[in-house]
Amino acid sequence: MMNYEIFKEVVKEKFMDYMPEKFKGMELVVEPVEKVNVTLDGIILREEGRNISPTIYINDMYKKYQNCGDLEETLMAACDFMERAYEQAPVVDV
């Protein structure tokens, strides 16, 4: 089983491979996100002309990976969640 840092690098490399074709032109960005007393590693997808994106936390993905032991299952579930969340996110003009 991979440690967290290796897992994070693999997720950065492979995440977009599991996203549907319509997301392929987007930029995957991993950024630290400050929460109460903790910093999490967030994934967002940037699309030109869109100012808002859902965030998925690699930390949560790693917990799922530790429980199931299956990287592909973990990535598929995260990408499915991202797709649904992205489609429900409002378009905000700034």
What residue ranges belong to the model's regions?
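Negatively charged, low-complexity tracts enriched in Asp/Glu with abundant Ser/Thr
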Residues: 1-34, 68-76
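Solvent-exposed amphipathic alpha-helical surface segments
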Residues: 18, 22, 82-85, 89
